[in-house]
C-alpha cells in the first residue's frame, strides 16, 4: 500500500529520501542568505518602501476636510490648495492639493468645480489674527463694510492657490491658519491677514482666549498695520473721519469692532435663547 510521506509508519528509506529532497531544495536559499552582501538589496527595498509610504502620508496624501486634519499638524505643517469659495471677509474653503503641480495638480489631476462634487471635500479655513466686519447672517443687520471686505477677499484669493499654516481648530470646526497667496505681476508671497488690515477691511483679533497670530512678532505687525490704515482712513476707518470738507453731510462716527458687535448681538439674543431652551 502507498505510504503517506508524513506517516510515522513510513519506511525509514522514504523518510531519508524526503529529507534529502527538502535539503536539496532549501540549500540554494540557505547558501544565498548565508552571504552577508545578499541581504543588502532586500533591506534597501524594504527601507525604500517604508520611506515612500511615510513620505506619501506626510506630503502627498490629500486631506478631504477639517475632520481629517490631525492635531499633530498644528504649529508644524502647512496645507497647499485651491480656494473654491469665500464665505465672508475672513473665511474660505480650501481644496487640498498636496504637492501642487509637481504632483500633477492642474494637468494630471483636476480640482472639482461642481458644488455636489466639492461637498465634504474642502477644508474650512478661518484666517488667523484678524476679524472682518460681520455679515447679515441669521437675520442680523450686517456691519458696515462687511460686503466690501468679502468682495476684497474674493477678488484676492478665489480660484487661486494658497498656502495655509495651520495653528488650531476653532469651535466651528474651522482650521485657523495664516494664509499666503502669490499674485501677479511679480507673484510675491502676500500675507492675506496683512492685506485685509492694510485695506481697512479687518481689525486685529481681540478675543482674550483662542486668539492665534502665528507668533508675538506677527501680532505686533498686524496691530501696526491696523493703526496705519486707521490713520489713513482706509476701509471701515473712513467712517471715523466723516465726509471731510467735500462731503460735510457725512458725519464722523465711532467704529464698532467685529468682536464688540458679536458681544452686543450675543447679549441681545440671550433672553430669546433662554426662552427657546
From Swiss-Prot:
UniProt keyword Transport present: no
GO molecular function, one term: endonuclease activity
TM spans (from-to): 39-56
Active site: 126, 134, 174
The protein's Enzyme Commission number: 3.1.-.-
InterPro entries according to UniProt: SNase_OB-fold_sf, Staphylococal_nuclease_OB-fold
Keywords, ordered alphabetically: Calcium, Endonuclease, Hydrolase, Membrane, Metal-binding, Mitochondrion, Nuclease, Transmembrane, Transmembrane helix
Domain TNase-like: 77-239
GO annotations of cellular component type: membrane; mitochondrion
Binding site for Ca(2+): 131
Compartment(s) of residence: Mitochondrion; Membrane
Bilayer topology: Single-pass membrane protein
UniProt similarity note: Belongs to the LCL3 family.
PANTHER family documented for this protein: EBNA2 BINDING PROTEIN P100, SERINE_THREONINE-PROTEIN KINASE 31
Name of the protein in question: Probable endonuclease LCL3
Upper taxonomic lineage: Eukaryota, Fungi, Dikarya, Ascomycota, Pezizomycotina
Gene that encodes it: LCL3
